[in-house]
Amino acid sequence: MQGSARDFLKPKLVDSVELSTNEYRVVLEPFERGFGHTLGNSLRRTLLSSMFGSAITEVLIDGVMHEFSTIEGVQEDVLDILLNLKEASVGLNASETATVIIEKEGPCQLTVADIEANGTDVSVFNPEKVIATINEGGKIRMTLTIGTG
């Protein structure tokens, strides 16, 4: 680092390229040692905090008292089902919240596509993601609340 604030390197815009409709590459240089990380972290935090999205915010599974339970006739335990639901990529089309009720009887697989089939305001982006495997004679009924934030 230089001696005084007047001697700091002053970065300039070198290049700005539009890679796609949602992606840009901006090159600024030169930076003092460590300043690039500081600026990059600040930009990342600012951009991430200003993004809006939708996610499953509440799950109620019939007959389940807590997340460490198991469901008769379902291969995964409740904790695995919740972790699979956490990976579901969902979006809301109109409202700020939506409630979706899913009922399935086995043998079959419960997938993220079943969320879209039951919720009119909900769209899914990874419909092939498996939430649970329901065995012969097994059934599951869950209520999902999807919210934005």
Describe the function of each predicted region.
Residues 1-149:
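Protein-protein interaction/assembly regions in multi-subunit complexes
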